[in-house]
Amino acid sequence: QDEEAATFHLTGNFLGKQRTFDFTFNLAEATTKNAFVPRLWASRRIAYLVDQIRQAGAAVVAQPTAGAAPIVHDPRYAELVNEIVRLSTEFGILTEYTAFLATEGTNLNNWNELIASCGYELNTKAVHTRSGIGAVNQAKNFNFQKGQTVLNRGNAYWNDQLQREANFKSVQQISDRAFFHRGDRWIDSRLVSNNITFAPMTVIKFGSDDHLHLLEELIRERRQGVLSLQGDIELLHEGRHVLITNDDC
């Protein structure tokens, strides 16, 4: 990753005067201990994007047009749907609009299908459900997510019966990575968010010398926790698509 220092410029009114403040961050000092920061940002970002679609849909619901295509098919909002799915898969963040990602039958190799499923959920719920208990739970989820200050590792949210959904064992957030369970295999979320569907280039057997070497590399990166998953693991590591096989799990 790019480890050059990054400078953040903040301009605004301070004590009645126009001021500019510069903050410099040394990215070389960043570690996986800070992995919660981008994940919190992604969660808040998803809430913001959903709210943009929901607000835009208000006019559609108020003045419906016969035969009109769902608002999520509008290129302006289709881009938002795509970004919601990308962030959800990359960071392993589930909402009521992307909970299908945890379902065993969902094909993670079909990006267009994932976009269509998310678009359907957004159109059905965020756009058209504006009253009753189904609207209340969406408001509760939005209010939590937009101001989120702690990780929601269990991906708990309020469903349309105002019950807490929190049983998503098929999605795991580990360090700055996320994994989806399919069959007897865990799949690195970056393979999904980057739409990588080709077969693994490298196969490593659990307990082999290559496996120990990979473990040492992950320890140096403080990402060794990803190898704690039971079963086979598809991992994107240093640009390589790796399959770790474990016949004993």
PLM regions and their residue ranges:
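Long, folded non-catalytic interaction modules
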Residues: 201-218, 241-249
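C-terminal partner/receptor-binding element of secreted or periplasmic proteins
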Residues: 221, 225-249
